[in-house]
Amino acid sequence: MYILETNSFKYYLGERLLFKLPALKLHTKSRIGLIGLNGSGKTTLLELLAGIRPIPAAAKIICKTTMTILPQLKERLSKSGGETTQAYILQALKQQSGLLLADEPTNNLDMDHLLWLEKELRHYSGALILVFHDRDFLDALCNEIWALDDKQLQIYQGNYSNYQQQKIISEKTHDQAYRKYIMQKTHLETAFSAKQQQAQKAVKTTKISLSEARITGAKPYFAKKQKKLQQTGQSLLTRLDKLKQIEKRQSLPIIKMNLLSSKLWQG
């Protein structure tokens, strides 16, 4: 049973595209790990799904369950950072909503509280969307990874380790396509530039005598030659315009804060 569904839509901040979403579907057992570069829109996405940020006119978000969001920025209370974080977590967990959205809930927690949080989330009865920078949490709790990468949300089945394996294959394929695109683009640009130079030289008569250049038919010959070179150049330019552009990929941050096992990993 799906508890939350969206259509595919784009989200802008002013005139800047923040991200493009595919159609999303969450069921009761969804355990989503949301990852991405700082500023990629993770918090914004949670707020859109939670209904606390206005959605675009073309967007459609249908939620069929109760929802609680645990925000990253907490109100100031007369407690330490760890106690404040724990207080918000307890409050959110007690609501037992069908969908819990948590934005970096491990902030300010010590090791004992991290282990406690991992246990609580593991046994949480509802669905989860979690923003973490900890590989152990992502591996222990998630069955799907949402990666905000290059202004698009990519979906990977499995935990963070599964995501890494799929990502390596995807990156190799993309890098090969990017290198091929650059080679084709460079080849066409070089060929076009050469034809332009040849066309400019075609009307010059420095290598023949003035009397030869005045012979009837000489000028039409060079003009015809120039036109043919220009047509070839235009054909190359058309091919260049039709060449599918492939952008150089941006790498997501290395996740290495494995606090649960206290080991350092590099994803």
Give names to the regions the model predicted.
Residues 1-13, 81, 166-267:
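Coupling and communication elements adjacent to P-loop NTPase active sites across diverse families
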Residues 1-174, 263-267:
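ABC ATP-binding cassette signature C-motif
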